[in-house]
Amino acid sequence: MELVLFDISPESPRDLYLPLSTNHRSSSVNGTLEPHGVTFFIIQGLTNLSERKMILFVILLLGYIIILGGNSMIIFVASTDPKLTSPMYFFLYNLSLVDMVYTTTTIPKMLSGFLTDVNTISMPGCFLQMHFFIQLGVTGYAILTVMAYDRYVAICNPLRYTAIMTRSIKLLLIMGAWGFAIFCTLPATSMTWKRPYCGPNVVRNGWCDLSSVRRLVCADTSVDNIVSVSFAILALLTTGVLILTSYVLIGVSMLRMGVAQRLKAFGTCAAHLTVVSISYGSASFVYISYRVGNFSAEDRIIVSVLFSALTPFLNPIIYSLRNKELQESIRRTLSRFRPAAVIALKDVNT
């Protein structure tokens, strides 16, 4: 069995991997690393950016605040406004919740890493971050698939929409999305968790990315790679094919409609179709950028960070701009808080 301890390349000098933990030290006799010595990982992140590091910190912090604020607003209005009773808003509520937790698994830890010289994370914390980052990412795609099915039923079977999309069906679809994500994620992350880590312990990414952590395994990971690729293909192909099928059927149905009905149907799908295009487009861009071009390690991390936060950042903006019902609900919500704020201000002044 081949032991892959570290990767020495022009972009990854060996001194980057010198362990900082006293529990995984090199043997002075034969140069091998002591087994079972890694007790924590060091997130390399963007420590080599110097002056650009603070610029990226501010951008990432502002983006994270907007992600939390925008998605929190959608969750609040979708759960409290009695006029937003359509199943679409129930699914949007869940998508916003997933986006918030998805970004929270990585961005706060990355922000703290900008402010410290060494960004460390415990082994359990690293694998929990890895698992939930991947699982929530797949859950987001699965919910987008459920939303595509919802649009298909609404446009192609409008008279049976309320009979099909009942409360139990909505809950079943959401539970199915979460279950599908767990099924596609747990095998790969659990296999990586059980592998031995003898050192080095530097993760060459902005967070505990699965492939970056697997490079630190001191054992043969060929089976792990096959399992990871298989389930990644299953997750992306299943959701992608189902979304594409839904929109093909919607397109066929729209061809039989009048112009006014066709425009209304397109308006119903526009926000979701935009989000789907951005989600799969950004994922494809990150995949391609890692395999072509002369990208440095820091540039690749920046690309992956920005594009992983892009969809959660744009979701509330897109749905707020393209959905009139949601716009009106946000205005009603803000108008309810405005009189209370004025009364409170008057009380303070008196």
Across the structure, where does each feature detected by a protein language model lie?
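Transmembrane helical core of 7TM receptor-like proteins
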Residues: 1-350
